[in-house]
Regions:
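Conserved AAA+ ATPase "sensor/coupling" helix adjacent to the nucleotide-binding pocket
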Residues: 67-71
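Short glycine-/polar-rich loops that comprise or flank the Walker A/P-loop
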Residues: 19, 45-50, 97-101
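Conserved phosphate-donor/acceptor-positioning beta-strand/loop module used by diverse small-molecule
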Residues: 44-65
Length: 120
């Protein structure tokens, strides 16, 4: 099911890039191979692909993912089951230096910090 969804989203991203639009994927690309697919789509459309990696301690990430979704309008699917969180984090492939990620400290996310990180 997830493969079909991401294949569909990749097709949409490809078409948007062909049409000269910008695309932002706000999701967890835990695997290098998935990020490589997006880089290829971008490259095929003469677009830039940039990985933004938000880093936090695993215990804080667990708390954010599994608690209090009802208090956040961005968490429309609710809390992630702890078992799903553990599966995802245990299989995580952080980006390598050759991917040139922009690394964001997830404990410092303020407007000023983000502007500084992205040079805005």
């Amino acid at each position: 099911e997830n493969i079909k969804l991401y294949d569909h989203l990749n097709d949409i991203a490809n078409q948007l890039l062909k049409d000269g639009k910008s695309v932002i994927f706000d999701t967890n690309f835990n695997f290098r191979s998935d990020r490589d697919k997006l880089r290829k789509i971008a490259s095929n459309n003469d677009a830039k692909c940039q990985v933004v990696w938000v880093k936090v301690d695993k215990s804080l990430a667990l708390k954010r993912a599994t608690q209090n979704a009802h208090l956040q309008d961005t968490r429309i699917l609710g809390n992630i089951p702890k078992s799903d969180f553990e599966r995802m984090t245990n299989n995580l492939e952080p980006p390598n230096e050759d991917e040139s990620p922009i690394v964001v400290d997830g404990t410092k996310v303020t407007t000023e910090y983000i502007r500084k990180i992205f040079g805005l």
